[in-house]
Amino acid sequence: MIRVGIVGYGTIGKRIADAVVAQDDMKIAGVLKVSPDYEAKVAVSRGFPVYTLPDRVEKFKKAGIEPAGTIEDLIKASDVVVDASPEDVGRENKEKYYQRYDKPVIFQGGEEADVAEVSFNALANYEEARGKRYVRVVSCNTTGITRVLTSLTLNGVGIKKARIFIARRGADPKEHKKGPINDVVPNPATVPSHHGPDVQTILRNVDIVTMAVAVPVTIMHMHMAYIELDSAYPKDQVIEAFAKTPRIFLADVGAGFQSLAQVIEYARDLGRPRGDFPEVAVFRDSVTTHGNELYLMYGVHQESIVVPENIDAIRSIFGTLPKWRSIEKTDKSLKLTTEGKRYG
Amino acid sequence: MIRVGIVGYGTIGKRIADAVVAQDDMKIAGVLKVSPDYEAKVAVSRGFPVYTLPDRVEKFKKAGIEPAGTIEDLIKASDVVVDASPEDVGRENKEKYYQRYDKPVIFQGGEEADVAEVSFNALANYEEARGKRYVRVVSCNTTGITRVLTSLTLNGVGIKKARIFIARRGADPKEHKKGPINDVVPNPATVPSHHGPDVQTILRNVDIVTMAVAVPVTIMHMHMAYIELDSAYPKDQVIEAFAKTPRIFLADVGAGFQSLAQVIEYARDLGRPRGDFPEVAVFRDSVTTHGNELYLMYGVHQESIVVPENIDAIRSIFGTLPKWRSIEKTDKSLKLTTEGKRYG
């Protein structure tokens, strides 16, 4: 059993913790919280040992939570640390704590690529995290793009260049202070947005440019993709590629999937934890070929898409399972769509 | 003085009416309203003769508005009719009324292209409406795209193909029943959206594909454009083209234009009627060249962008002014941005 310490039990960390619990080859060593808020109490109720920073111990005690120890105690109790701290805090934690212990650490996409030795996506480069000390699971949008592009190339559809146009959700559901409201915000106004270069930390040779705007939505990101292929391919070959690629879901308008909200409604109806949808939701009706051009729209659930990637990153680091067996195990344990999927 | 009858005094019609009032070569013959609501009362307070449909006369009287006559009386009192009815109602009006009178009619972009002999954009094909009986001013998004592409070609920047990705405003500010709220809706899920073919009703040979999603915004549409040019051009040449093209405004992030809402705030600060912004608002920072590729983002104010186009369409039909003199006269009378603009 791999003992996993989760540093940062927020939007991503709490989901990874629950995903770890669903595995039979790993378990939670503990989770680190900075504030003794309702999320900390949820961690306690889940039975997770709750650690905190040295200067927060008294605060936790006052709030009725007895900390299991400090961050360094958590690192010592873990075989691997998953850092899901807010942007840039992961790097601070590395300098302050992780460098002093000989434990592998997985960072999230909020950190710059050079925080780690390798940027990770299970479909694209599972093997590259093997034995690494520092691994970074790329961010939600980058994960979505990487899955779509890798699905194509794994299935014989060659890519000449990808131009992706992103309508980003402005905030997560719980972020009550973030906007926009009734506005569309270039994010950034310059081209490219960071997503293109970020994809290239994994798919090093892909010709990709991305543009992004933020919109008043908390539910999911939406991508409009224009991809030039290396020749003309039948649309059915592209659809078939998506249909058999794990962690891609084909949403049909005819089946009621007319928008991102309907994808999340489906997740809620399925009883998925927190109404999460870790698959890339490709709108099947949008998949269009036009000579050697491919168009498609897809949704990316920013809160959950990286969760299965973190689970696979753990197995990849320790080399306990090969790529496809890990992906399949993760998907089954998290009850992702497995019907028609080809694992290997 | 050209006497202009406005059929449909809603979002577009009321703006065209005010724009007509600002001209010294045309005047309002009257406006047609179907409901005696607050907009009808605004029309009365503006001093416009208010006409209605035959079966609505009593309703208007009960509401305290004495109609000046019926739609046929309005047609008779006009030299030209601008039909700004809801989608498809323009065509019904044509079949029911306009065909029986020998007066030119201008339709809006909500109607299909074949309602008219020519689709119109002042920059692109001003001369083609000359002497026509039925003219159609294309819709807001189509007008925005047509201006941007025409600005490039008029200034020596050749276009190979245009791929435009649109985050549409979900509703106008007054449309209280329309959505989405907290959702991104493929609009449509199929590719292309109608905008590409609609641009081709004016720029017949342009290779264009468009995709669109609707977002929870009432303020403006946002376009992300990817344009392949016929060779590499310096970015400055593109910026210069936009800078001197009438009805295109370059919004600098450094000057505070960080989003669409800031563009509208500027219009409000300028004291523009209804806070309108009929110019295409190009985010200067987004204009990027990359080999022969051009990227940019721009906002399109759906409520007002077609207003100056309708004024020019009237002059074009009657041949009272050549293209650039009409555009300049319209822009000055409506107090659009004229600094640095080249009219001719």
Swiss-Prot record, chains A, B:
Enzyme Commission number, as recorded: 1.2.1.59
Catalyses which reaction(s): D-glyceraldehyde 3-phosphate + phosphate + NADP(+) = (2R)-3-phospho-glyceroyl phosphate + NADPH + H(+); D-glyceraldehyde 3-phosphate + phosphate + NAD(+) = (2R)-3-phospho-glyceroyl phosphate + NADH + H(+)
Classification via PROSITE patterns: GAPDH
GO biological process, one term: glycolytic process
Locations listed in the record: Cytoplasm
Enzyme class: oxidoreductase
Protein residues bound to NAD(+): 11-12, 110, 169, 302
Mitochondrion as UniProt keyword: no
Binding-site list for D-glyceraldehyde 3-phosphate: 139-141, 195-196
Active site positions, chain numbering: 140 (nucleophile)
Pathway it works in: Carbohydrate degradation; glycolysis; pyruvate from D-glyceraldehyde 3-phosphate: step 1/5
Secreted listed as a keyword: no
SUPFAM superfamilies: Glyceraldehyde-3-phosphate dehydrogenase-like, C-terminal domain, NAD(P)-binding Rossmann-fold domains
One GO MF term: NADP binding
Main location (coarse class): cytoplasm
Subunit organization: Homotetramer.
Family listed: Belongs to the glyceraldehyde-3-phosphate dehydrogenase family.
Protein name per Swiss-Prot or TrEMBL: Glyceraldehyde-3-phosphate dehydrogenase
Species of origin: Pyrobaculum neutrophilum (strain DSM 2338 / JCM 9278 / NBRC 100436 / V24Sta) (Thermoproteus neutrophilus)
